[in-house]
Each structure stands twice: as structure tokens, then as C-alpha cells.
Amino acid sequence: MIQVQTRLRVGDNSGAKELMCIKVLGGSMRRYASIGDIIVASVKEATPGGVVKKGDVVKAVVVRTKKEIKRKDGTYIRFSENAAVVIKDDRSPRGTRIFGPVARELRDRDFMKIISLAPEVI
């Protein structure tokens, strides 16, 4: 569960290291984001020479959350950190590599490029 002011690690090589959520997209009073949801975030920490700089406002998709989510078969999945991938307006990732595992739920939300770049889909 990601809400406004939540800090997330970045799971790609776009140049950002840490994001802070400033808006959850999808509804006027929407409060929480889960895996597969799009957020608007501010870059709080970045690597020098990256595509995005500190202070940039970017869109990102949540790929890992510490809060567990329930699947249709009754199992639960959770990760050890909150992480997101910076995306463009056409929902494709801004980086060329994805780090760490991503959840299978991204496939249902049509983030196939992120699924194909990820080293592990859980």
C-alpha cells in the first residue's frame, strides 16, 4: 500500500534511486496504490549522468510492495521493499534494465515490456 509521501526504491536503470509518491492516479480521492498501479512521484535521489535528475516529477508503476496482496488461488505475496519503475507517457519503461523480481500481476495490467525485461517474475 503506497500513499502520498511514501518513499520507494527504483527498480530500473533510469538514473533515479529513490522516489517519493506525490499522487496516486486513478480516481479523484484515491488514497492507496498497490502492485501495478501508476503513481506520480518526485525523484529524491539520483545517480549522476542518468536520464532523470533529482527534483524531476515522473510517472512510475509500483512493482513491489511490503504489504501483501492476495491472489485468486488464495495465496499471498509480499516483498521486502517498496519499489517502482519509472515509465513514459506510453507506459513503457524509461530505463533499459529492470532490477529485482516483479509480481505476475503486472501482466494483467499490460506492462509486458517490464515483464520481459525483469530477471524474475513471481
UniProtKB/Swiss-Prot annotation:
GO cellular component, one term: cytosolic large ribosomal subunit
Annotated GO biological process: translation
Keywords from the UniProt entry: Ribonucleoprotein, Ribosomal protein, RNA-binding, rRNA-binding
Database matches in SMART domains: Ribosomal_L14
InterPro entries to which the protein is assigned, alphabetical: Ribosomal_uL14, Ribosomal_uL14_bac-type, Ribosomal_uL14_CS, Ribosomal_uL14_sf
Listed Pfam families: Ribosomal_L14 (PF00238)
Superkingdom of origin organism: Bacteria
Gene Ontology molecular function, alphabetical: large ribosomal subunit rRNA binding; structural constituent of ribosome
Subunit field text: Part of the 50S ribosomal subunit. Forms a cluster with proteins L3 and L19. In the 70S ribosome, L14 and L19 interact and together make contacts with the 16S rRNA in bridges B5 and B8.
Function: Binds to 23S rRNA. Forms part of two intersubunit bridges in the 70S ribosome.
Family, similarity comment: Belongs to the universal ribosomal protein uL14 family.
Protein name, per record: Large ribosomal subunit protein uL14
Organism per entry: Desulfitobacterium hafniense (strain DSM 10664 / DCB-2)
Source taxonomy: Bacteria, Bacillati, Bacillota, Clostridia, Eubacteriales
Primary gene name: rplN
